[in-house]
Amino acid sequence: MSANSFGKLFTVTTFGESHGPAIGCVVDGCPPGLEIAPEEFTHDLQRRASGKSRHTSARREADEIEILSGVYEGRTTGTPIGLLIRNTDQRSKDYSNIAQQFRPGHADYTYWQKYGIRDPRGGGRSSARETTMRVAAGVIAKKWLKQRYGVLVRGFLSQLGEIRPAGFDWDAVEDNPFFWPHAAQVPELETYMDALRKSGDSVGARVDVVAGGVPAGWGEPIYGKLDAELAAALMSINAVKGVEIGDGFASAAQRGTEHRDLITPEGFLSNHAGGILGGISTGQAVTASMVLKPTSSLRLPGATVDADGSVVDVITTGRHDPCVGIRATPIAEAMMALVLMDQALRHRAQCGDVGEVSPRIPGQVDV
């Protein structure tokens, strides 16, 4: 299996399976001197973790990071950073009955067709367990971006099934298990998810992610566009079926006079472009959203075939998320941070001597 690495100057390679002994990653290209300690990974890893509420998978992993290399006396050395998390709560017997069956809507069939062999335990490499290491690598990128440029990356759940936020408050996002920006709606979400779990079905979701403080100039104009690489990064997350930058698909119904972000010396008057023009950051907030499909691991029977081609009904037992989007916010944040750090290093390598060009337009102003 190839294509397990991400990035150009700042790269991340992940490895491991859902029910293997461990998962891990190698982070290469991190500048030396960044202070980092194992306990700094805990917050974001726990934000992504399952088993924290009745609305996610009951699997409980400690997700304790081991730093194997690339850090000496608490500081990065500039050499590859090896990170490892040992799996401790696998329950592979849950998959014995479907080991030879292809779950509809899952990667079982495509992995089988590509490789002629697959690990059925928990989805193997196609499991969202892999994203744990993306979040771990993202901790490094987030810290470097914040210290070096003041960039803050954060996200929230912007749709759960048919439900959308009735208001917005960043302070509310971290105070509920949904990363929902309107606290008054949390009871409604709880009721909705309780009914969904009882029915045995699943539902899709949407996550928005925002990076504030991104300087103008990051990104490359043709094949290394910031928005193209960000879209690819978010699309690589399990279950993601669509990505928007800025207004995205809503742009189809807009007029040019509405969509263009007017510029004044005091700042841009809007941000329909999502902080990116011509593949290069404008200095405004970089905004993106991703849509996640409903999980296909259901306890409701569904028609499929097995490895022999026989028609069967598949029922997935075990521990699964009825909505994978609930835990996806820290994953989206991590992928945006990884893209931004890689682009920042590439910009510095080629254009570091350019300096600040006038006029420098501030980000969006309140109108």
UniProtKB/Swiss-Prot annotation:
Catalysed conversion reaction: 5-O-(1-carboxyvinyl)-3-phosphoshikimate = chorismate + phosphate
Binding site for NADP(+): 48, 54
Residue positions binding FMN: 125-127, 238-239, 278, 293-297, 319
Cofactor: binding details: Reduced FMN (FMNH(2)).
Pathways involved: Metabolic intermediate biosynthesis; chorismate biosynthesis; chorismate from D-erythrose 4-phosphate and phosphoenolpyruvate: step 7/7
NCBIfam families: aroC, PRK05382.1
Function: This reaction introduces a second double bond into the aromatic ring system.
Name of the featured protein: Chorismate synthase
